[in-house]
Every structure is written in structure tokens, then in C-alpha cells.
């Protein structure tokens, strides 16, 4: 029967421990969407759309070049709905309040409170109601504030789109600005630099269009999009050059495109649906505190019936025995645990908020401290998500100012839209050099970029009788129109030997994760008229410019600090292995053997788990790869954090014990995260880890103190009940003692923590807690029994007529020893000398001890059935407490050496 009750309680724990602060919007096929990767049907549909020509796309989606009219829009919207992404829906406040209340201890305390009320023990019922109420409200208020702050961050990059629509009955059309939720499949939209892609699109016209897809793919550099595919056999929709996906951003250029999918039917929508519908399993904090809770509840369920049976059998008054057993049950239940946990977490959240960190879920604070593996995306998380000019070299790989200045003139004088590479080149030259170059060279003409040539040229003149054509573009395209190279200052033919040297240098740059662009030139006699493509011939290859998305300045020190704190960092990125390895090298992370997404497709969970343990860098991963790796690392017993900012990171953010999103993250990433960093500095990660460990240490102090003290008290009660002709303490005394002790614990969230307790990840360990109870609980029982002997033999309180004196004597010893244990157990060091508690805790425990001594002498003594103690009692009290502290310190030293100290 006991096992059945235990199983039921365990089930209750798993269901009711702190839950996320949201409820899910139901979607069609939600279970299949949440449980699988992007459906094959969606991939097939995207590939089919990519393969269509413009007329086929118009027919397939019911649109036409002049735009849809109002009737057509409503008809299509009736089928596909608004262009809105399925999202998590905030709970009503009353549901949130219920979720904050329904943890096992609150439910258990409520039952005990109702029993106390039914037996007219209003004092106990009131105390219990107060504890439950404070805990619930603290949790409710703090999480509501955090959620409100997180909601305030949700702002789309652009909430309108430029759409061609029929505007009157005459069939006239115009470009109009509409909220993106009003788009429907078949709409014709116009794109320009800076626009967010408002839906899934098929490009039908494009000019110099580059789109940043890092939020979906992890690819740090923008990709080109065109109207006619250059790779019709492409089987990955995200790499199709005629498709654009919702949530990505136009970096440069212009385009017109047809809407092919909206809302939940988009690629973004499918990922969002997966995240919204996936019911997250309990995280490490919830599981850990659940196991500890079960240990304490089991202990209470075993000891309370024993106390009832012994007292009922020896005293003969079963009703009195039942009331006493109920008081013992209340005393054994750590009713302050929910409040201590919540207030400690809330204090951690407040401290982190001063570091501009939003903590959406309070239990994420402790998970921060328990985290032993941090998986992180690369682009925009570790890196700046900004392209910079890294190298400018001649063909031998030596730094060349000539190449830099030629590239600058090309980027400066071109009149087309300047892409990110042009911006990086322009920023790579200081202002003085830029003024000198622009003053020295005048523009003559240009040959614009196009996708067939994949290069662009400008013609400049320093002297009136000579023009210089400067061309930059993709390496192979420049080689195709070059016949010579500048080598060690000389012009030499581009032969096979030189070509091998060029390949060797550029391959080395590529292996460093750099994107290489070639620069070439030639001198021409001055002439009138325009320059044409045919003039891009017989060029001299000057060298290369190479680009990189560099790490944030704080990345390397942050990762170093995390490593020093015992946290293993793993990179999970959708970018190429070469680029990712370069970033790892830049931030001081040993990448080792790189694993790419295609390598893990056919691995079993056990094989991948083994691989994940020893691998630092994973590249070319899909969102589902990231989620799977995080889940398997958790299965191996690790507490896993994931840090990311893109759409492709959302499933992994949800799967992790602690999801961390960074500044500038997309909405879906913020929504899936537990913690949001508002500062670009990643050093706040280390602050969060330390705060999490400090929070855990303070929570564990309360649990250890309460568990060991309660174990000792119950053991003492059992001994006294077996041999005394009266109750060793009245139920009222137990409740008052428990209340006063609990009051002294209110300051624990403000306590100091020893340095050694925050040097490595901390985890819940019920076995260690049980062992701790067995070691330290009986110490208090030894001195309780000495107190029994003192009161019985020295003060002759050994008859029912003198039981009040006996109970008063034990009440004071029990309260003071219980309160002193706070200072003994809060540190492995010598208390008050090597480690001192924070002043709020010293003040609170001092006040409670003073009140405990004064209570038997106060006017309330008669009401509380206590009596004044003789002065001769107090030297004995000092001796008992001193002995208790000395023995506890000795046992603590042995325990710490043998088992360690959390």
C-alpha cells in the first residue's frame, strides 16, 4: 500500500512541479507536427514551387500580375487563414495563479491545514495558510513581471509589406502597404533592402537581391536570390535560390515575388508549430526538487504513524496522540520550502535583471547553476552577425595595401546597391586613406554586377591619358577573364604553376572559414564612350580580399570563464564546418574532430549520444539535429543549456534544461527561451552561472537544515514518547517552535555563499541528503536526550504535575539548537570565524533565539502552557549548546572529507 501511495505522489510531483507560464494554442495535427521534423510534404511542395516558371506559379496559386482583388483575397483567406504564426498563448491570471500554487508541498500543507482547522487548531491552520499564501504570491508576482518584460521585447522587424492589389471596380491596381497578417497565397509583393520576408515567396524578378538566412540556416553570409534557378537539381529547399522564407531579411537589392505560403503553412510556421505544441518535459530543477520532495514526504509518511502508535499505546489517549502526530507531521513538512525556493529564485532574478537579463521562468536560475554543458549556436550568438574585412593579400597571401585600395575604389565608385561585402571593404580603410584615394582617383565609368558574370568593374583615372579598370568578384569568374598575375611586384603569365599557387593560397583562406573575393585590374588608354563587358578581359590578378563574421569581443573571455566554472561548451551551428572551426579557433575553443549534420542522420540515439559526449563542434545542422543532440545529452544525465537567436534554434531552446536567447533574437527564439540577454556582452553568462549556484546553495542549506533537524527531533520524540509518562512537548509547542524556526529562515535567500560552493555545477542529490540526515540528525537527538536527563534528574521534572517545566526546558533547547544549526550547516568552514552569515540571517536568528529564551518568562507563557525556567538552567543550556556546536563541527569535518560538501 505504501508503495502505491508513493507512486501516486511521484506522479503528482511530475505533473505539478513548477510549469511553464503558458498554455498552448491547439493546432491541426499538433502531435505529428511536434513529434517530427519538417514534413516531407512541405519539402516536396517547396521544391515543386522552385522548379516552376512564372506562369506556372501564377496558375498554381490563383494570382495574377496586376494583383488580387478584395473578393479573391477573402476567398483565399477563408481557406488559408490569416498570415499569423502559431504562438504560445499566455495563461489567464487565475490559471497562472493555480499553476504557481499546485506543487506537492502546497497541496500537502493544504490538507494538513484543513485537518488542523477541522480539529479546531486554528493557530496551526493559520500558520499553514500564511506559508502557502506567501509562497504562491511570490511566485505569481515574479513570473508575471518577467513575462510582461519578455512580452515587451516582442517586436517584428517590419510589420507591413508592399503588395500589389486591385483597388477599384475598374480593375486598376496599385502598390499598397498592408499589415503582413493580411497577406494571402497568390499575392504579389515587392521587396527592398531592410525588409523582412513576410511569407514564403517565389522570386519572379530580382536585381542584386541578397537575403540573410542565418535565423533559419545558421549561414553567416547573405545568399543570392534570383528569378531563374542556377541549380535546378537542388534538393534542399533552404538552398533553393528562387525561394525566400518568412522571417529572413533582405540585405540588399530589390525583387518582386509571389506569396506561396502564409502563417502556419510556411517553413517558419512549421517550426513555430513544433515549438508551440511540444509539451516540454520537466527540467533538471523540477526533477531534482521532485526527488528531494519525495524523500521528505516518504520520511513524514513513515514517522508520523510511528509517533501516533507509540503515543497512543503508551499514554492511552488516542485523540491526544492523533493531535500530537498531526503536529509532528506539520513539523516534519518543510512548509517553508516553496517560499524559500521561490524567494531565493526571485532574488536571483532581481539581481540578474540589474545585469539586463530577463528571467522568464524562475527555475531557470537554479538550472543556470546546475548546467554542466552549454550548447550554443554560432551566428549572432558567439559572433557579431556582421561581415568584416579580415584579410587583403596579394596572390602569395602577403598583406597588400594595393589590393585593399583597389577593392575600396571598386566598392566606393559603384552605383548599385552596396551589399555587406562592399560595406565591409569601405569600413576597412581609414578616413584619411579614403579621402586620399577619392581625391587622387576619379570615376570614369562602371560595368554593373550581374548574376551571369558574378563580378563588377569600375573604371577610374589618375591621369587623363590612362584609365584603370578594377574588377572584383568570385574567384573563378575573375580567373576566367585574367591572363596575368602580379607576383612579387612583377607582371607574370597566369600559367598552371601560378594557378596551383593561387589555389593553394585561396584554399588555405577557405579552410580558415573566410569568404574569398578576387581583385583584378588592367590599364587602358583613355577613350570616349562607355565601357562594356568585353573590356573585362586580359586582366591582371592583383590578389584577394577575405571576409569573416567575427566573434563578439566578450565571447572568448566568457567561454574561458565558463570552462573555469566546470562547464563544457559545444557549438551547434547550421553554418559550414570551415567557418565554424575558424570561429572556434578565434575564441580559444578546441574544435577537435568536426561532425556535420549528414554524418548523424543515420546514427542511432545511443551512437549519437556517445558521439555528442566527445564532440565539441557540430556543423551544417538542421533545427531537428540540434534538438536531438540536446535531448540526448540530457538523457545522459547532463544539465544542458542552449543559447541561440534564430528560428532554427527554437526547438533546441525548448528542449534544453535552460534556453538562453540573446539581443536581437527573432520572436520565436525569445518565446522558447527561459532567459533573455539584453546586453551584447556574453560575460553575463558567467554572472548567471554564479548566481544560479549561489541560489542553489542557499536552497540546499534550508533543505539540509530542515531535514536533519526534523529527523533529529522526531527521533527525540520517539525516545521521549516511549519512556515519559507525558508528552515531551505539546502540539502547540511544536507548532510555535516550528513557526519561530521558519521565521529565522526567511533571510536565507540573502545569505553569503562560500567560494568553493560556486566553483563547479551543483545538482540535486537525494542520496546525499538522506546520508546527511543520518549523520547530523542524531547529533541533535544526543543533546535532546541529555536535556531530557537534565530536566528529569537535575530539575526533577519527572511527573505529570511537572511536565510544563520539562516541556519548557526542551522547548528552549530545541529551538536554540535548531536555530544554531543554521550557522553550523550553512558552511563547511568554522562558523563565525572562517565564514560568517550575511547580516540579515544573523539578525533574524538572533531575534528568534532571544524570543525563544524570553517566551517562558513572558505574559504569554500561561497561554502557551510554558513556565519560567530557573536561573540554574542557563549554564546547563550554554554547555549543551556548546557541546552541540563542537560535535557538529567535528562530524562536519569528517563528513566533508569523506563525502564532499555541497
Predicted regions and their residues:
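Non-lumenal N-terminal regulatory segments of integral membrane proteins
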Residues: 1-184, 189-197, 202-210, 214-282, ...
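Cytosolic catalytic regions of ATP/NTP-dependent phosphoryl-transfer enzymes
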Residues: 64, 243-251, 367-541, 547, ...
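Alpha-helical transmembrane segments of multi-pass membrane proteins
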Residues: 99-118, 132, 136, 158-159, ...
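Helix-interface capping motifs at the ends of transmembrane segments in multi-pass membrane proteins
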Residues: 107-127, 170, 295-333, 346, ...
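Hydrophobic alpha-helical transmembrane segments
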Residues: 119, 127-158, 165, 281-376, ...
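Basic, amphipathic juxtamembrane/active-site segments
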Residues: 210, 227-231, 384-405, 585-589, ...
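Membrane-interface segments at loop-to-transmembrane junctions
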Residues: 284-294, 325-329, 360-368, 693-705, ...
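Membrane-embedded transport module
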Residues: 303, 307, 338, 345-347, ...
Amino acid at each position: 500500500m505504501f508503495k502505491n501511495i508513493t507512486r501516486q505522489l511521484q506522479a503528482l510531483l511530475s505533473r505539478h512541479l513548477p510549469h511553464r507560464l503558458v498554455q498552448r494554442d491547439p493546432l491541426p495535427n499538433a502531435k505529428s507536427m511536434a513529434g517530427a521534423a519538417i514534413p516531407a510534404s512541405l519539402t516536396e511542395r517547396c521544391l515543386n514551387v522552385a522548379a516552376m516558371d512564372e506562369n506556372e506559379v501564377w496558375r498554381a496559386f490563383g494570382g495574377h500580375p496586376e494583383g488580387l482583388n478584395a473578393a479573391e483575397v477573402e476567398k483565399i483567406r477563408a481557406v488559408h487563414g490569416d498570415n499569423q504564426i502559431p504562438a504560445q498563448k499566455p495563461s489567464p491570471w487565475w490559471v497562472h495563479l493555480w499553476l504557481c500554487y499546485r506543487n506537492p508541498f502546497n497541496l500537502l500543507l493544504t490538507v494538513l491545514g484543513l485537518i488542523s482547522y477541522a480539529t479546531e487548531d486554528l493557530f496551526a491552520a493559520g500558520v499553514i495558510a500564511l506559508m502557502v499564501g506567501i509562497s504562491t504570491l511570490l511566485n505569481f508576482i515574479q513570473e508575471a513581471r518577467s513575462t510582461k518584460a519578455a512580452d515587451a521585447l516582442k517586436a517584428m522587424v517590419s510589420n507591413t509589406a508592399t503588395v500589389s492589389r486591385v483597388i477599384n471596380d475598374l480593375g486598376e491596381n496599385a502598390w499598397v502597404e498592408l499589415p503582413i497578417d493580411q497577406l494571402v497565397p497568390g499575392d504579389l509583393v515587392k521587396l527592398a533592402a531592410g525588409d523582412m520576408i513576410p511569407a514564403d515567396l517565389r522570386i519572379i524578378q530580382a536585381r542584386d537581391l541578397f537575403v540573410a538566412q542565418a535565423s533559419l540556416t545558421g549561414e553567416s553570409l547573405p545568399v543570392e536570390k534570383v528569378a531563374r534557378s542556377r541549380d535546378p537539381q537542388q534538393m534542399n529547399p533552404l538552398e533553393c535560390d528562387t525561394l525566400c522564407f518568412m522571417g529572413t531579411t533582405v540585405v540588399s537589392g530589390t525583387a518582386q515575388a509571389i506569396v506561396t505560403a502564409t502563417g502556419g503553412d510556411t517553413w517558419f510556421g512549421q517550426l513555430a508549430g513544433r515549438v508551440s505544441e511540444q509539451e516540454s518535459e520537466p527540467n533538471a530543477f523540477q526533477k531534482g526538487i521532485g526527488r528531494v520532495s519525495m524523500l521528505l514526504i516518504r520520511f513524514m509518511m513513515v514517522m508520523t504513524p510511528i509517533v501516533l502508535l507509540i503515543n497512543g499505546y503508551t499514554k492511552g489517549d488516542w485523540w491526544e496522540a492523533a493531535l500530537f502526530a498531526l503536529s509532528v507531521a506539520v513539523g516534519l513538512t518543510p512548509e517553508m520550502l516553496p517560499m524559500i525556493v521561490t524567494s531565493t529564485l526571485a532574488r536571483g532574478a532581481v539581481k540578474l535583471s540589474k545585469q539586463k537579463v530577463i528571467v522568464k521562468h524562475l527555475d531557470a536560475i537554479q538550472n543556470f547553476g546546475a548546467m554542466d554543458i552549454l550548447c550554443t549556436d554560432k551566428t549572432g550568438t558567439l559572433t557579431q552577425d556582421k561581415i568584416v574585412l579580415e584579410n587583403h593579400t596579394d596572390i602569395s597571401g602577403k598583406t597588400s595595401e594595393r589590393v585593399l585600395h583597389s577593392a575600396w575604389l571598386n566598392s566606393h565608385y559603384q552605383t548599385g546597391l552596396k551589399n555587406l561585402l562592399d560595406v565591409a571593404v569601405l569600413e576597412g580603410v581609414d578616413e584619411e586613406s579614403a579621402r586620399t584615394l577619392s581625391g587622387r582617383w576619379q570615376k570614369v565609368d562602371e560595368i554593373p554586377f550581374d548574376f551571369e558574370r558574378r563580378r563588377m568593374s569600375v573604371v577610374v583615372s589618375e591621369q587623363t591619358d590612362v584609365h584603370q579598370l578594377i574588377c572584383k568578384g568570385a574567384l573563378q569568374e575573375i580567373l576566367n577573364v585574367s591572363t596575368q598575375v602580379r607576383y612579387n611586384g612583377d607582371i607574370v603569365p597566369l600559367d598552371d604553376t601560378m594557378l596551383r599557387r593561387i589555389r593553394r593560397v585561396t584554399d588555405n583562406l577557405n579552410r580558415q572559414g573566410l569568404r574569398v573575393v578576387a581583385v583584378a585590374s588592367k590599364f587602358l588608354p583613355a577613350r570616349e564612350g562607355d565601357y562594356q563587358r568585353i573590356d573585362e578581359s586580359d586582366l591582371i590578378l592583383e590578389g584577394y580580399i577575405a571576409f569573416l563574421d567575427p566573434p563578439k569581443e566578450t565571447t572568448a573571455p566568457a567561454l574561458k570563464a565558463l570552462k573555469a566554472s566546470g562547464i563544457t561548451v559545444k557549438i551547434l551551428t547550421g553554418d559550414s564546418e570551415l567557418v565554424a572551426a575558424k570561429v572556434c579557433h578565434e575564441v580559444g575553443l578546441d574544435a577537435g574532430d568536426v561532425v556535420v549534420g549528414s554524418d548523424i542522420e543515420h546514427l542511432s540515439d545511443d551512437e549519437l549520444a556517445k558521439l555528442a559526449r566527445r564532440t565539441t563542434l557540430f556543423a551544417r545542422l538542421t533545427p531537428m539535429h540540434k534538438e536531438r543532440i540536446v535531448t540526448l545529452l540530457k538523457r545522459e544525465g547532463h544539465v544542458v543549456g542552449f543559447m541561440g537567436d534564430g528560428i532554427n534554434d527554437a526547438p533546441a531552446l525548448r528542449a534544453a534544461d535552460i534556453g538562453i536567447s540573446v539581443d536581437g533574437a527573432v520572436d520565436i527564439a525569445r518565446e522558447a527561451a527561459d532567459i533573455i540577454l539584453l546586453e551584447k556582452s556574453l560575460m553575463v553568462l558567467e554572472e548567471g552561472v554564479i548566481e544560479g549556484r549561489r541560489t542553489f546553495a542557499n536552497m540546499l542549506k534550508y533543505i539540509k537544515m530542515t531535514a536533519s533537524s526534523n529527523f533529529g527531533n522526531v527521533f527525540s520524540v520517539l525516545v521521549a514518547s516511549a519512556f515519559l509518562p507525558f508528552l515531551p512537548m505539546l502540539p502547540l509547542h511544536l507548532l510555535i517552535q516550528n513557526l519561530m524556526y521558519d521565521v529565522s529562515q526567511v533571510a536565507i535567500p540573502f545569505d553569503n555563499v562560500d567560494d568553493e560552493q560556486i566553483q563547479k555545477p551543483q545538482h540535486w542529490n537525494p542520496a546525499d541528503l538522506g546520508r546527511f540526515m543520518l549523520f547530523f540528525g542524531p547529533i541533535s537527538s544526543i543533546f535532546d536526550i541529555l536535556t531530557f536527563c537534565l530536566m528529569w534528574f537535575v530539575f526533577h521534572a519527572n511527573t505529570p504535575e511537572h511536565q510544563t517545566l520539562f516541556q519548557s526546558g526542551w522547548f528552549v533547547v530545541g529551538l536554540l539548537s535548531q536555530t544554531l544549526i543554521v550557522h553550523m550547516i550553512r558552511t563547511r568552514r568554522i562558523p563565525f570565524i572562517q565564514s560568517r552569515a550575511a547580516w540579515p540571517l544573523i539578525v533574524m536568528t538572533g531575534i528568534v533565539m532571544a524570543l525563544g529564551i524570553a517566551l517562558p518568562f513572558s505574559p504569554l507563557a500561561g497561554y502557551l502552557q510554558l513556565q519560567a525556567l530557573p536561573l540554574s538552567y542557563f549554564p546547563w543550556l550554554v554547555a549543551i549548546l556548546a557541546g552541540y556546536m563542537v560535535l557538529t563541527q567535528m562530524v562536519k569535518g569528517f563528513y566533508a572529507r569523506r563525502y564532499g560538501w555541497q
